[in-house]
């Protein structure tokens, strides 16, 4: 039976409120970074309350509660105590019957509980038994959730007799759309406002944000405190209910722990009986289980060569400094429409049994095949935007005039059209089968787009929760196809991604997903890079191109010039794919995202609006180059202008304060509360020299 919300007896959202110990000391003027990290970890937090929101998925009944505790470690609850008190409360309010609790006194009829939290690794350490608890859930993207077996607890609910409870932990942060990862944003999507707490006076008679001193809020504003604490638990439950509604709409059997897992499940569903043939999988010699299947020989024998041709996006900045636009030529930020989902539509059923090895350039230029190659190349010296990627390891991809590249056939096509001299050192391609021309991922992308269309609001500025979930699942599909492909690379550099296994306390190599395929990953990313490169090289020479970031670019090209630049063979292919996946059959392949009249460009992924204007005058270009401001600004424009000020006044000694949480590995080994560690880092908004300046 699949794990759906209605397969649980209870859904329990939970939250803890706490205050950092160093902020509740007598001397509050001592900066946090003056305290050694080891002491901060040891001091941890003071938990002041536990709050729960309870939901019965069978009846729709709900209730909630908040329980204050003394802020001492000795007074912390165990998770078993939380379950005991919560199930008793649910029983009192009719959400679970006494008879059901008594049945669970037998191990074969456990009470099934879905435990929902938002960023669970902030809350789980608030339990007294975290030392044991940390091994009973799985680490997923720097937080905790249940991926494998549920945890079993035995709270004493009726007459001190233990009842067996099977608990699956869901972290709503892992189930949130991009840009909506905070509780207040999830609440806004649901129409449930995340509450705030008032400012409070600390021991130094200073007014500080209440969220930093929840112990004082609890004492001086008890009603606001309780409402705030309960609301956080309610939002977690409500979002999990929305995720289950999404699962039901998409006809999926399981409520996965992440949005990516839901996307992968849908891809497998639409693949149906073509799944193994499409992905190039077959049963191994010792097992017939799906999880034990292996790649066919056509992939296995060439897996490192294929993986060497798998890269990320094209990310470069071409200028450095502040740039004013010319009259009637504002800076426009363009994106490829649905880049990766459209790229996925290229894939048909490969003939895995007949890999073709060749050094014939013409054979690799066939853009109706899946081709990868290692080549030596040289572009004409006046080429503005060379198009063959070279992995510069720590610098990422660079695009030199001459060098050796692992690339795809799509990129070779663009380079040839630019007049590059190309020598193929090794090449490999797979043709598509002629007896089965199905494009399986088109079915997936259409399911995404149909779901988005059906869930769309009338508003042009707001999206519904379901629309965002469909979009996120569509975007996650490519990520699952590419998961752990890089570990097969043999080129210089560290390509293996290690993850921490909380069940064992050891580091482990990230494994592929059920739909990982190295050739598909290489081909999809190669197609996107090739299309973007073709557009760049087709722009007129007078166009000022500021930067390119994966599937978009910033330049002062007019709409007409951009349209003319999208008429090459790769853009034509991309346009054909676009018609297959767009709900209205549109073949538009570019979309305008932002505009500005004056911009700062400093480095890759570092660009800022100085003066708004152009066709989208309310938008702000804000690529922060990995930095964030210590103090929040009221708008994106204010944030952008503050970065411009910092850039203009910076010196070689300029520092920026950054607060990073201790790693999940550190937290696990110390059984520590979640704390952040302030660090002063040297600011680097300088040109990154992925290209050589010419003037």
Predicted regions, residues:
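Papain-like cysteine protease catalytic domains, especially those used for deubiquitination
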Residues: 12, 22-23, 109-110
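An active-site-proximal beta-strand-loop segment
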Residues: 16-44, 474
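Structured nucleic-acid-interacting core domains from mobile-element enzymes and related host factors
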Residues: 1-13, 29-31, 324-327
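Two-metal-ion RNase H-like nuclease active-site motif
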Residues: 8-20, 332-334
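Conserved acidic
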Residues: 40-119, 124-695
């Amino acid at each position: 039976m699949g794990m759906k919300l209605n397969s649980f007896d209870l859904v329990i959202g939970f939250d803890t409120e706490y205050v950092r110990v160093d902020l509740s000391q007598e001397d509050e003027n001592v900066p946090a970074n003056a305290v050694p990290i080891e002491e901060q970890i040891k001091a941890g937090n003071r938990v002041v309350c536990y709050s729960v929101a309870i939901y019965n998925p069978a009846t729709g009944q709900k209730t909630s509660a908040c329980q204050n505790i003394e802020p001492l470690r000795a007074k912390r609850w165990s998770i078993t105590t939380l379950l005991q008190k919560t199930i008793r409360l649910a029983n009192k309010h009719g959400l679970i019957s006494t008879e059901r609790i008594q049945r669970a006194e037998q191990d074969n009829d456990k009470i099934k509980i879905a435990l929902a939290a938002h960023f669970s690794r902030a809350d789980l350490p608030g339990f007294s038994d975290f030392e044991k608890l940390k091994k009973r859930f799985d680490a997923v993207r720097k937080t905790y959730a249940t991926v494998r077996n549920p945890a079993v607890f035995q709270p004493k609910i009726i007459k001190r007799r233990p009842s067996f409870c099977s608990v699956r932990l869901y972290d709503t942060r892992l189930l949130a759309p991009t840009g909506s990862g905070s509780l207040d944003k999830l609440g806004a999507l649901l129409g449930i406002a995340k509450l705030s707490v008032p400012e409070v006076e600390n021991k130094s008679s200073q007014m500080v944000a209440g969220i930093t001193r929840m112990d004082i809020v609890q004492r001086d504003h008890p009603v606001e405190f309780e409402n705030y604490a309960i609301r956080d638990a309610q939002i977690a439950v409500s979002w999990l209910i929305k995720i289950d509604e999404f699962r039901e709409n998409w006809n999926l059997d399981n409520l996965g722990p992440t949005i990516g897992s839901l996307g992968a499940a849908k891809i497998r569903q639409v693949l149906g009986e073509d799944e193994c043939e499409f992905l190039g999988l077959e049963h191994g010699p010792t097992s017939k289980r799906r999880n034990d299947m292996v790649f066919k020989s056509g992939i296995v024998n060439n897996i490192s060569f294929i993986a060497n041709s798998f890269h990320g996006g094209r990310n470069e900045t071409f200028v450095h400094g502040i740039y004013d636009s010319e009259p009637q030529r504002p800076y426009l930020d363009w994106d490829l429409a649905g880049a990766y989902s459209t790229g996925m539509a290229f894939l048909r059923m490969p003939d895995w049994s007949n890999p073709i090895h060749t050094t014939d350039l013409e054979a690799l230029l066939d853009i109706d095949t899946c081709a990868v190659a290692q080549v030596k190349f040289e572009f004409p010296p006046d080429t503005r935007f060379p198009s063959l990627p070279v992995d510069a390891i720590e610098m990422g991809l660079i695009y030199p005039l001459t060098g050796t590249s692992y690339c795809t056939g799509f990129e070779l096509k663009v380079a040839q059209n630019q007049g590059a001299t190309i020598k193929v050192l090794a090449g490999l391609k797979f043709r598509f089968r002629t007896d089965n021309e199905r494009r399986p991922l088109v079915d997936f992308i259409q399911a995404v787009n149909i779901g988005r269309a059906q869930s769309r609001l009338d508003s042009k500025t707001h999206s519904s929760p379901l629309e965002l979930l469909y979009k996120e699942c569509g975007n996650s599909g490519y990520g699952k196809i590419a998961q752990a492909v890089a570990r097969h690379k043999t080129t210089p550099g560290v390509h293996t991604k290690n993850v921490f296994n909380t069940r064992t306390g050891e580091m482990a190599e990230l494994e592929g997903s059920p739909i990982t395929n190295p050739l598909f990953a290489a081909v999809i990313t190669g197609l996107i890079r090739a299309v973007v490169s073709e557009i760049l090289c087709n722009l007129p020479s007078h166009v000022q191109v500021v930067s390119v970031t994966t599937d978009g670019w910033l330049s002062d090209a007019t709409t007409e010039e951009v349209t003319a630049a999208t008429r090459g063979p790769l853009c034509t292919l991309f346009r054909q794919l676009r018609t297959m996946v767009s709900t209205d059959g549109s073949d538009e392949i570019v979309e305008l995202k932002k505009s500005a009249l004056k911009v700062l460009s400093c480095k890759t992924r570092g660009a800022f609006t100085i003066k708004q204007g152009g066709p989208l005058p309310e938008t702000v270009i804000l690529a922060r180059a990995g930095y964030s401001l210590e103090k929040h600004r009221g708008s994106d424009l204010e944030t952008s202008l503050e970065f411009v000020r910092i850039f203009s006044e910076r010196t070689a000694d300029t520092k920026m304060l950054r607060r990073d949480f201790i790693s999940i590995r550190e937290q696990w080994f110390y059984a520590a509360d979640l704390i952040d560690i302030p660090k002063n880092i040297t600011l680097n908004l300088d040109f990154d020299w992925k290209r050589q300046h010419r003037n």
